[in-house]
Amino acid sequence: MDVFGDEAFNVPDSTDWLGTPLACLMPVEQAFRCHVCKDFYDSPMLTSCNHTFCSLCIRRCLSVDSKCPLCRATDQESKLRGNWALREAVEAFKNSRKVLLEFARTPPTIQAILPDQAGPSSPSKRKATEMEGPKEEDPESKRPRRSTRSTRARAAELTAAILQEEQDTTPSADPDYVDQPPDDGLVACPICLTRMKEQQVDRHLDTSCPGSPQAASKRRPIPAQTPQPSTFPSFNTRLTSQTNQKPPERLPALAYSMLRDTALRKKLSELGLSTHGSRQLLEKRHKEWITLWNANCDSSRPKKRSELLRDLDEWERTVGNPGTAAGGGGGQQGLGLMARAQATGAQIKDKEFDGKAWATRYGGSFGDLIKQARQGIKRQTLDGNGEKADTKGGGGGEDVGPAELPTLQAREGESSAAPTRMDIVPPSSPPRPGQVDDADTEHDGQAPGKDAIAEDTAMREQVIPGTPDKERQWETSQQQQPPIPGDAQLSGMKKPNPETC
């Protein structure tokens, strides 16, 4: 495969001149290349520190840190000036580079000429003889010089004769010559033969016509010379064509910190740009569009708006939003979904939108979404009722470790709905009339037996669940309770001691 013949691999570089007779052109080409993009200058702009860069390159650099990429001096976009002379030089070098490089890479070919193939008066033979030169010097070596001088004299005489013949055969000297009026849109005055516009002939005859056709006929009218287009347009011609074209207006920069998201999206919409994405992406998109647009204003051949939009899209997919390109093309899919959703929204907002056809087409999808939403609500309701039932039932089913058992029992005792004995008869309040202790009433004023003591102990364990410290605290509070006066039956009875029984 011819690698050098493929344009994808044949990237022009200044090192292409190495190994050729024109290796001295390598620094010349390096001087014509930008220090940022390493390509030929495209609309070169001169900074305030006298450095030159491409218009797009320097504007991107200044939009980041407002400093020159070479000397790191502070600069602004408003101080950039176009270097048009360098632009003309770069264009001329780019147009002639391919031809010069092919000429430098082509080896010189010398054709050998045999004596019998050329006559004695052949100029190529004389040229070859002069290039080779005599090997031995002799007195007759000066003859070619005299013959050369005589040849030059004869050539000069022949040239003079040709010029004289041309002068003798001019149309003015030919009696049969008929003057043809030039096709320039003008007419000649019938008296003085002065050429002018047809509308000016009558006024010329009344005011400024000399009125002597003999004197006017003696001098030959000089036709108006129309400028002929040159195959090599000069700098002045290009400058005139540039000044005739009205340059596009530049876009001003925005203070993004002073704009809300709605205002920024409105600015992008006015410029015909996309409005989807985060706040950071919107700012970067607007800033890059301003850079592309203002750099295009500096170009001698501005691009179309469609080309600039294509460049912006390429920048956003490669540089502007690199996070979307990660993950094996997931970002591109996200951009596609976002663009599709945006197009769908615009379609729905259209006043000619067919709602019935849309409902018929996507009714099944909406029904599935509604069904899923209802099932989710029902599931959440059932889960909430189950949690409430578990809470009312004491949270059965949960495994509690031994270390958490005392704390859990104390919490259950505090929040239990069953009243305790202390809640029924507080220690500091006297009992109501006719109220008797359940244990004492059960034994009819007699000392309780072992069965009664066991039942009382079981009842205390049920009423006040918890640790032995909690039970001991309850017994102490019962012992410290003062006797109730006026109740002989209760005052005569003693509380049984479980240790003695």
From Swiss-Prot:
Region of interest called Disordered, as start-end residue ranges on this chain: 111-154, 203-250, 377-501
Similarity comment: Belongs to the RAD18 family.
Zinc finger residue ranges, UBZ4-type: 186-214
Pathway(s) the chain acts in: Protein modification; protein ubiquitination
Oligomeric and partner information: Interacts with E2 mus-8/ubc2, forming a complex with ubiquitin ligase activity.
Ligand binding (Zn(2+)): C189, C192, H204, C209
GO biological process: postreplication repair; protein monoubiquitination
Basic residues: bias regions: 143-152
SUPFAM superfamilies, per the entry: RING/U-box (SSF57850)
Alphabetical keyword list: DNA damage, DNA repair, DNA-binding, Metal-binding, Nucleus, Transferase, Ubl conjugation pathway, Zinc, Zinc-finger
The name this protein goes by in its record: Postreplication repair E3 ubiquitin-protein ligase rad18
Catalysed reactions, semicolon-separated: S-ubiquitinyl-[E2 ubiquitin-conjugating enzyme]-L-cysteine + [acceptor protein]-L-lysine = [E2 ubiquitin-conjugating enzyme]-L-cysteine + N(6)-ubiquitinyl-[acceptor protein]-L-lysine
Entries under CDD domains matching the protein: RING-HC_ScRAD18-like (cd23148)
ZnF segments: RING-type: 34-72
Role of this protein: E3 RING-finger protein, member of the UBC2/RAD6 epistasis group. Associates to the E2 ubiquitin conjugating enzyme mus-8/ubc2 to form the mus-8/ubc2-uvs-2/rad18 ubiquitin ligase complex involved in postreplicative repair (PRR) of damaged DNA.
